[in-house]
Amino acid sequence: MLGAALRRCAVAATSRAGPRGLLHSAPNPGPAAAIQSVRCYSHGSSETDEEFDARWVTYFNKPDIDAWELRKGINTLVTYDLVPEPKIIDAALRACRRLNDFASTVRILEAVKDKAGPHKEIYPYVIQELRPTLNELGISTPEELGLDKV
């Protein structure tokens, strides 16, 4: 059905009005010009979980990261269909601390809670794993700030 619609569009686009206003259709394309279904997104190599984690930890551990890069990284990370590993969140929180960006720390923790969705055991696990970092950096969780009740 889609192939027929695409062929109709191609014929309509290549039709021209002749000198007397008559429409002349384009020549019928041969089998070599047939529309092929190609999955262009599946040709790349897949990234392992360890490589993914290392890439993001390295990104957030850059000593010269600025506020824009931090927010861009957080926004990109949140768009993935996963809950980031605690070591990635740890690196992001440390980058926030280097930039003195407390609002982003709260945003990261809220995003982790949101990404956990209905799986209520994930967020407490992440907070438990991050507790030493949170204490070291002086970061309060959204629950400690009372933001979960707003």
Curated annotation (Swiss-Prot):
<keyword id="KW-0832">Ubl conjugation</keyword>
<protein>
    <recommendedName>
        <fullName>Cytochrome c oxidase subunit 5A, mitochondrial</fullName>
    </recommendedName>
</protein>
<dbReference type="GO" id="GO:0005743">
    <property type="term" value="C:mitochondrial inner membrane"/>
</dbReference>
<comment type="function">
    <text>Component of the cytochrome c oxidase, the last enzyme in the mitochondrial electron transport chain which drives oxidative phosphorylation. The respiratory chain contains 3 multisubunit complexes succinate dehydrogenase (complex II, CII), ubiquinol-cytochrome c oxidoreductase (cytochrome b-c1 complex, complex III, CIII) and cytochrome c oxidase (complex IV, CIV), that cooperate to transfer electrons derived from NADH and succinate to molecular oxygen, creating an electrochemical gradient over the inner membrane that drives transmembrane transport and the ATP synthase.</text>
</comment>
<keyword id="KW-0809">Transit peptide</keyword>
<comment type="pathway">
    <text>Energy metabolism; oxidative phosphorylation.</text>
</comment>
<keyword id="KW-0597">Phosphoprotein</keyword>
<dbReference type="GO" id="GO:0045277">
    <property type="term" value="C:respiratory chain complex IV"/>
</dbReference>
<keyword id="KW-0472">Membrane</keyword>
<feature type="transit peptide" description="Mitochondrion">
    <location>
        <begin position="1"/>
        <end position="41"/>
    </location>
</feature>
<comment type="similarity">
    <text>Belongs to the cytochrome c oxidase subunit 5A family.</text>
</comment>
<keyword id="KW-0999">Mitochondrion inner membrane</keyword>
<dbReference type="InterPro" id="IPR036545">
    <property type="entry name" value="Cyt_c_oxidase_su5A/6_sf"/>
</dbReference>
<feature type="modified residue" description="N6-acetyllysine">
    <location>
        <position position="87"/>
    </location>
</feature>
<feature type="modified residue" description="Phosphothreonine">
    <location>
        <position position="141"/>
    </location>
</feature>
<comment type="subunit">
    <text>Component of the cytochrome c oxidase (complex IV, CIV), a multisubunit enzyme composed of 14 subunits. The complex is composed of a catalytic core of 3 subunits MT-CO1, MT-CO2 and MT-CO3, encoded in the mitochondrial DNA, and 11 supernumerary subunits COX4I, COX5A, COX5B, COX6A, COX6B, COX6C, COX7A, COX7B, COX7C, COX8 and NDUFA4, which are encoded in the nuclear genome.</text>
</comment>
<feature type="short sequence motif" description="SIFI-degron">
    <location>
        <begin position="2"/>
        <end position="17"/>
    </location>
</feature>
<dbReference type="InterPro" id="IPR003204">
    <property type="entry name" value="Cyt_c_oxidase_su5A/6"/>
</dbReference>
<keyword id="KW-0408">Iron</keyword>
<dbReference type="GO" id="GO:0046872">
    <property type="term" value="F:metal ion binding"/>
</dbReference>
<dbReference type="GO" id="GO:0006123">
    <property type="term" value="P:mitochondrial electron transport, cytochrome c to oxygen"/>
</dbReference>
<keyword id="KW-0007">Acetylation</keyword>
<keyword id="KW-0349">Heme</keyword>
<dbReference type="Pfam" id="PF02284">
    <property type="entry name" value="COX5A"/>
</dbReference>
<feature type="modified residue" description="N6-acetyllysine">
    <location>
        <position position="113"/>
    </location>
</feature>
<keyword id="KW-0496">Mitochondrion</keyword>
<keyword id="KW-0479">Metal-binding</keyword>
